[in-house]
């Protein structure tokens, strides 16, 4: 039986509920007037006959500045579903990155991949995932997994959540209409979405197909970096992060709830939509951000600064100044440094770098690194501009600024080794000739000429 639906799952048009502005604010939102209890969290009887449910993303005793939780007022508690059963034969998702059949020895080679092909069969967002690499352990709540997705079907009568970590979703092709328990996010390429650990959601594809990247953060929640001497403004500004208003549906039927726990998928029958949160308040909620709003910082004298100036979000580790995960972007920007090699320089790094490309061309690679593709440069693997880029950048007139336009690249940088999965090392998308882009770098050394 289907009753009045406030929010439809067909996603035939963009959402209308709108957004609240700010990063990790104490939000308060209700889809029915008076649905939020006044001056208390768990009244004896919640308004409209709703259930009060606390949704915790951190320990109860986490310091107040880091404590994340929300109170949800919903038609049924999240506990109302049938028992979960393991989805058999499901091994395309990895959550433990020690040596195993799924994670072979990690080569020190530079690695690069072409985009995943679009599926030949109807495939939704969840079934379109495949794990490319990662580190740490979902069970230990440390590290991350990096997935790619390619899908051509909206999720129908099916809902999903990950208990393993929060999901940083980077669309490359195709819009995503993401319905969550706490409201709706409409996300397009050049935007990102973050779905907190445990939030139930479904994804519709208004353009019929979609492809992109997911960084699943097992550890400390993503946060905005400190700005230090940059000052009180810059990089990703808090006001540009958008969190949905409450919106709900009261819908009954034969549905499937899919849970991801320790890298395995589990399914349960559920007889109602979990998108039944009529009101909520708190600071643990999904959000989106438009990367085109990033306030890019750069040198206006000489040298190319470290890529930490492009940091959007970070997951901190237990070592001050060393992040578990950095999400960095390389957006359109002006380059004005004089007598300077302007592209990213040659580099070896104690951290490990997984890169993707949303749009255009990355300024350190003239060809081969294409939108939807990926690269991995692990700890102490040498990398940098290819031969063509080096020759061009070594001879341009640096008395004049130039604009790097029509681009959007990004990087997931981690403190620990990023281990590619067996799928990533065996797939036909792996570019066996990637190393050749540096073989054309010529010897210019002449001890007789400075």
Curated annotation (Swiss-Prot):
Binding residues annotated for Fe cation, in chain numbering: 347, 353, 383
Residues annotated as catalytic: 304 (proton acceptor)
GO CC annotations on file: cytoplasm
Pathway connected to this protein: Amino-acid degradation; L-phenylalanine degradation; acetoacetate and fumarate from L-phenylalanine: step 4/6
EC number in record: 1.13.11.5
Reaction(s) the record says it catalyses: homogentisate + O2 = 4-maleylacetoacetate + H(+)
Positions that bind homogentisate: 362, 383
Keywords noted in UniProt: Dioxygenase, Iron, Metal-binding, Oxidoreductase, Phenylalanine catabolism, Tyrosine catabolism
Enzyme class: oxidoreductase
Single biological process term from Gene Ontology: L-phenylalanine catabolic process
Cofactor(s) the protein needs: Fe cation
Superkingdom, natural source: Bacteria
Record's function text: Involved in the catabolism of homogentisate (2,5-dihydroxyphenylacetate or 2,5-OH-PhAc), a central intermediate in the degradation of phenylalanine and tyrosine. Catalyzes the oxidative ring cleavage of the aromatic ring of homogentisate to yield maleylacetoacetate.
Assembly behavior: Hexamer; dimer of trimers.
Family: Belongs to the homogentisate dioxygenase family.
Protein name, UniProt field: Homogentisate 1,2-dioxygenase
Source organism per UniProt: Burkholderia mallei (strain ATCC 23344)
């Amino acid at each position: 039986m289907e009753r009045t639906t406030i929010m439809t799952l067909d996603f035939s048009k963009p959402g209308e509920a709108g957004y609240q502005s700010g990063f990790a604010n104490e939000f308060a939102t209700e889809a029915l007037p008076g649905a939020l209890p006044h001056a208390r969290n768990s009244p004896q009887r919640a308004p409209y006959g709703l259930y009060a449910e606390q949704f915790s993303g951190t320990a109860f005793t986490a310091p107040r500045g880091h404590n994340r939780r929300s109170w949800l007022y919903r038609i049924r508690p999240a506990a109302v579903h049938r028992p979960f059963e393991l989805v058999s034969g499901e091994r395309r998702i990895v959550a433990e990155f020690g040596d195993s059949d799924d994670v072979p020895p990690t080569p020190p080679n530079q690695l690069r991949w072409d985009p995943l092909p679009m599926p030949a069969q109807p495939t939704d967002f969840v079934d379109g995932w495949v794990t490319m690499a990662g580190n740490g352990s979902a069970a230990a709540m440390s590290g991350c997994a990096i997935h790619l997705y390619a899908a051509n079907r909206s999720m129908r009568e099916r809902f999903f959540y990950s208990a393993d970590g929060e999901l940083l979703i980077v669309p490359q092709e195709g819009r995503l209409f993401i319905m969550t328990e706490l409201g709706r996010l409409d996300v397009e390429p050049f935007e990102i979405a973050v779905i907190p650990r445990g939030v139930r959601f479904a994804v519709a594809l208004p353009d019929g197909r979609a492809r992109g990247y997911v960084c699943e953060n097992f550890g400390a929640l993503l946060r905005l970096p400190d700005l230090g001497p940059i000052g009180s403004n810059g990089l990703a500004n808090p006001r540009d992060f958008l969190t949905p208003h409450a919106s709900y549906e009261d819908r009954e039927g034969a549905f499937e709830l899919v849970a991801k726990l320790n890298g395995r998928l589990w399914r349960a029958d559920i007889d109602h939509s979990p998108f039944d949160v009529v009101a909520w308040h708190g600071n643990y909620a999904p959000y989106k951000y438009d990367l085109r709003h990033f306030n890019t910082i750069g040198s206006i004298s000489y040298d190319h600064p470290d890529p930490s100036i492009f940091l959007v979000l970070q997951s901190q580790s237990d070592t001050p100044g060393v992040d578990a995960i950095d999400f960095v972007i390389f957006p359109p920007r002006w380059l004005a440094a004089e007598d300077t090699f302007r592209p990213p320089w040659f580099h070896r790094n104690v951290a490990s770098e997984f890169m993707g490309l949303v749009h255009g061309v990355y300024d350190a690679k003239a060809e081969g690194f294409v939108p939807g593709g990926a690269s991995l440069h692990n700890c102490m693997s040498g990398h940098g501009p290819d031969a063509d880029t080096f020759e061009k950048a070594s001879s341009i007139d640096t008395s004049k600024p130039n604009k790097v336009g029509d681009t959007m690249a990004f990087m997931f940088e981690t403190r620990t080794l990023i281990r590619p999965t067996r799928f990533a090392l065996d797939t036909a998308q792996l570019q066996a000739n990637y190393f050749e882009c540096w073989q054309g770098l010529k010897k210019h050394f002449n001890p007789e000429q400075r």
